[in-house]
Amino acid sequence: MVCHRYLLGLGASTLCLRRLAQYPSTEYHGIASRHRSPGYYAYILGNFNISNEEQLFSSVHSLANNDSDVLPVEDNGTTNLTGTGEATSETGKEEEVVNEPYNGNRMRNFCIIAHVDHGKSTLADRFLELTKAVEPHEIQGQYLDNMELERERGITIKLQSALIKYTYPKDGQVYSLNLIDTPGHIDFNHEARRSIAACEGAILVVDGTKGIQAQTVTTSMIAIEAGLKLIPVVNKIDVPFCDYESTVADLTSLFDFSEDEILMASAKEGFGINEILDAVVERIPPPKINLDRPFRALVFDSQYDPHRGVVSYVRVSDGIIKKLDDVVFLGHNLESRITAVGVMMPELRERDVLRSGEVGWLCSNTKDPSKVAVGDTVALKSAVKDNNVEPLVAFAPAKPSVFAGLYPCDGSDYMRLSVALEKLKLNDHSIVFEPSESSIAGHGFKCGFNGLLHLDVTVQRLQREFDVGVIVTSPSVPYKCILKNGKEITVSDAAHWPEEGMVKVSMEPWTNVTVRIPGDCHKKVSNLLTQMRGEFQKKSEFAGGKSLVLEYKVPMIEIISTFFDNLKSMTNGFGSFDYEGTEYREIDLCKLRVLINGEEAGGLSMLVARDNAYKSGRLLVETLREVIPPKQFKINLQAAIGKRVIAALSIPALRKNVTERCSGGDPSRKRKLLENQAKGKKYMAEIGNVSIPFDAYKAVHKALR
């Protein structure tokens, strides 16, 4: 019998009570409360053994008729997660776990799909705790989120994998479950796609207090198209305002689930964990086993180890692989010899062999990160020579939606930044970069990202993991323009924009935006999207109008500015959005040049709509006047289109009172001192340099967005 501290949320529905009654022989310890609202008494069934629906309702009505202010509670303060399934071995018997007998029918590969903060990492922690894959004293919040940045932000940035062992109670057999914890933020959707490629099934986790979010729907559709079996789970049912019934209604209408398929859980309290693992065994099919074919595997992730070189995470499709086997990475035709293979538990542990259907890692003593690409196929060398190997389906190339320049704070760190980006791309294949040069920041790279959060995380990883500080220019999107000579080019920054008069037609990217919001926020969010030049497409209602899905077409440049922050603010944190697809529409663009004392500051120039050029130019020079420190000479700030200045301001010179000691006497003496000072300032203005602080880039971007 399983013991749980369990609180079913305020306003629990009849449907929720019926679903709770289906969980077999579960003893619930009570939690005291003074609330007496209908349905709330399902939260506490102190020491009742619940085996059927009739007994459940009898217990609830008994509690409801209790007139005392505080219900009596007996609680030993413990939470037992051992459940009906058991771990196959205690920690310390690592060799038995790693090199266990192989049985493809008792293998399951699955990932967790959920929006940010819906509880997927906490659920993964409960899996590890229940199956004793990790010692209880080692378990900490977000255990699989091993990056310091992930713990600080409370989000998953990198996919993580772990092999866990679970004894299925109905047949007593031990099953190998390969769990992959995936990111939920839209900017890291590429990580979720790679997880899906390595699995046959997925647990779809939805926060019962917030409902289904837009990004969850998008990722789930990708999983369905890939043929994955989904297991729906409503999480956080211990929270008093969990709306279980509405969440179930949304799941059934969006994905055609039956109510019986949907599981309820509280990852925080450990309720429903056994039922989820049982469903993984029962519903997700085992991988296809092809042991008789030559070895072939898909590289779905990788990282760089200073001692081993490139460590590739693979899903083995065919055959077996072991140490000292000769392989070929088909993408770059790289021949190499395997130095080690193993599994993630979740730490990397070596084993003797990897077989068809398994998820693991391999090292080939490759030191060049650029030679091993995520999505590549690795195959046995002998089979490649016999032309007996076809590449597995690779991932679609990354298409960045946001571009920004990264320049080292110290000009001598250019090569260090180059090496750091190469190693980072090994772990995050969606980053694209190419060398660039700025008249202000010097040599650096123009980089492409999936969004502003992706950009921010990359900058912080460069600082923390590689100790390389960078200057970030204002983010932009890829524009297209047709020149008067008929040539079409793509431009992502002002530095590469053609000269004024050469462009015949310019175009900006638009995208399809899906916004999911509470029903009472409809007017505010619609007005926001209209201000962003958005075009309404469709509105859908869920849960009787409590939840709305709005579809708009919006310029990409508007999405990457402050839309996310504004949406969260207007919806009290409950709004979410997703965007996909790109189309180009005509717009009259121009390059807004920034001149400082007559010289162009290329790093601060930007592309703007010609209709807004005068407003943007004025705002730009006003912002620069606030962030550029004054000198002993006058600094002229100008915004120009081509050779025409459209806005101008100046920063007055610092003035020293050279006549301070001339208290009286001939006024010609004072005039002479002032003339000499003026000559000196003129000379300094001719030879002096104006230093632009690093914060100027951020200040300008914030002001114009």
UniProtKB/Swiss-Prot annotation:
Return the annotated region ranges for Disordered: 72-92
From start to end residue, where is composition biased (Polar residues)? 76-90
Presence of keyword Ubl conjugation: no
Q: Which UniProt keywords apply?
A: GTP-binding, Hydrolase, Membrane, Mitochondrion, Mitochondrion inner membrane, Nucleotide-binding, Protein biosynthesis, Transit peptide
Q: Where is the transit peptide?
A: 1-20
Q: Which reaction does it catalyse?
A: GTP + H2O = GDP + phosphate + H(+)
Q: Which domain of life is it from?
A: Eukaryota
Q: Name one GO biological process term.
A: translation
User: Can you tell me which residues bind GTP?
Assistant: 114-121, 181-185, 235-238
Residues in tr-type G domain copies: 105-288
InterPro entries named in the record: EF-4 (IPR006297), EFG_III/V (IPR035647), EFG_V-like (IPR000640), G_TR_CS (IPR031157), LepA_C_sf (IPR038363), LepA_CTD (IPR013842), P-loop_NTPase (IPR027417), Small_GTP-bd (IPR005225)
Q: Which one of the record's GO molecular function terms can you name?
A: GTP binding
Name the Enzyme Commission number(s) assigned to this protein: 3.6.5.-
- Which N-terminal residues, if any, form the signal peptide? none
Name any one Pfam family assigned in the record.
Answer: EFG_C
UniProt membrane topology term = Peripheral membrane protein
Compartments, as annotated in UniProt: Mitochondrion inner membrane
Of the GO CC terms on this record, one is:
mitochondrial matrix
Q: Which HAMAP family match?
A: LepA
- Belongs to which family? Belongs to the TRAFAC class translation factor GTPase superfamily. Classic translation factor GTPase family. LepA subfamily.
Q: Report the function annotation for this chain.
A: Promotes mitochondrial protein synthesis. May act as a fidelity factor of the translation reaction, by catalyzing a one-codon backward translocation of tRNAs on improperly translocated ribosomes. Binds to mitochondrial ribosomes in a GTP-dependent manner.
Indicate what this protein is called per its UniProt record.
Translation factor GUF1 homolog, mitochondrial
- Organism, scientific name: Babesia bovis
